[in-house]
Amino acid sequence: MNHSRSHALFAQAQTLLPGGVNSPVRAFKSVGGEPFFVARADGPYLFDVDDNRYIDYVGSWGPMIAGHNHPAVREAVEQSIRNGLSFGAPCAAEVAMAQTITRLVPSCEMVRMVNSGTEATLSAVRLARGATGRNRIIKFEGCYHGHGDSFLVKAGSGMLTLGVPTSPGVPAGLSELTATLSFNDFEGATALFDEIGAEVAAVIIEPVVGNANCIPPQAGYLQHLRTLCTRHGALLIFDEVMTGFRVALGGAQAHYGVTPDLTTFGKIIGGGMPVGAYGGRRDLMEQVAPAGPIYQAGTLSGNPVAMAAGLAMLELVQEPGFHTRLSEATSMLCEGLEDAARAAGIAVTTNQVGGMFGLFFTDDIVESYAQATACDITTFNRFFHAMLQQGVYLAPSAYEAGFMSSAHDEAVIDATLAAAREAFAEVAR
């Protein structure tokens, strides 16, 4: 493939943008090489500035569940912008979005629109702290909740030790309010609550880990956290920015049958536009300003164009059988990838929940962050580049989930698997 124009743009971008990008994973630091620059997208495909076409399994990191540039979403945006881009005042589309979310996700009796998933998680944690009068939160290894200071914390040398910041600029005093657990560790969660349960405002978790690749919860694990939170008076926050409306119409909470107190959303509810939201029990949400004393605001929150895009996308995912077909397509892809790897003599396993999947270069079923980080990253990186040369774009990191869309039909998946057979054979040589 020719990437001359992408190469020139990346060289220019590095003089103007930190690392040449506006979000770190896009720079290909994890896999090596240089990123391609996208010119347009349609259905399951991306097209770069050098006119190369890629089958896309990143999907803008999750929002494009119906494929890129879907006509219904595009038309909704075109119609909305005729009336203006931003009002800074209430609009009917905000109400329609709130009605849709509260209908599809019953645990959310009220919602507040924001501009990103990070805003949603930060606001949900502030609400939890304000509502409980407590300051500590618990998060999990491999779960990403945005770039807020409270979330950029890793576990210390022992499970119950104070948090340690993972980025310069995060005050140690703030990170000490965040405890980190291993995902799927039943005993660890119980022990930590026995130690500090009376101080915990909230547990925040991706119900399916999406930032250590894709790791589902073990049977009963989310319910175990629900029980611990209820017992100790802490709130349970599900970060469904990735899983919301993707793994099931009602999100991971519907898929696993566990009800959180608060939920955060993003990605799909914007249809590709910058949007986030958080919602939950009415008694909690009524404490958010101006109804209550817990402050949160945003100039562009509830933007009419973003609401129009999100409403159109949510209409699409409500079509009968949408999620069943999406899950079946994802299973076809994952099974085919495992078969292709096995034929080449390469150890690969996959995880899948609905239209979300993970590819791990290991013989083991991956159920924890530690297992994910123990996989063969070097071989993944070689496979990534071999697939890219075959015109298939996977997430440019071994620690990011993949996303299926309804535009990935059987022919597209067959083409992907043909490319994978070539790529695995190349890696095996």
From Swiss-Prot:
Pathway(s) this gene product operates in, as recorded in its UniProt entry: Porphyrin-containing compound metabolism; protoporphyrin-IX biosynthesis; 5-aminolevulinate from L-glutamyl-tRNA(Glu): step 2/2
CDD domains: OAT_like
Subcellular compartments: Cytoplasm
Pfam families listed in its UniProt record: Aminotran_3
EC number from the UniProt entry: 5.4.3.8
InterPro entries: 4pyrrol_synth_GluAld_NH2Trfase (IPR004639), Aminotrans_3 (IPR005814), Aminotrans_3_PPA_site (IPR049704), PyrdxlP-dep_Trfase (IPR015424), PyrdxlP-dep_Trfase_major (IPR015421), PyrdxlP-dep_Trfase_small (IPR015422)
Key words, A-Z: Cytoplasm, Isomerase, Porphyrin biosynthesis, Pyridoxal phosphate
Positions of modified residues (N6-(pyridoxal phosphate)lysine): 267
Named cofactor requirement(s): pyridoxal 5'-phosphate
BP GO annotations: protoporphyrinogen IX biosynthetic process
SUPFAM superfamilies the record matches: PLP-dependent transferases
Catalytic class of the enzyme: isomerase
Family statement: Belongs to the class-III pyridoxal-phosphate-dependent aminotransferase family. HemL subfamily.
Subunit record text: Homodimer.
Matches recorded under NCBIfam families: hemL, PRK00062.1
Protein name per the record: Glutamate-1-semialdehyde 2,1-aminomutase
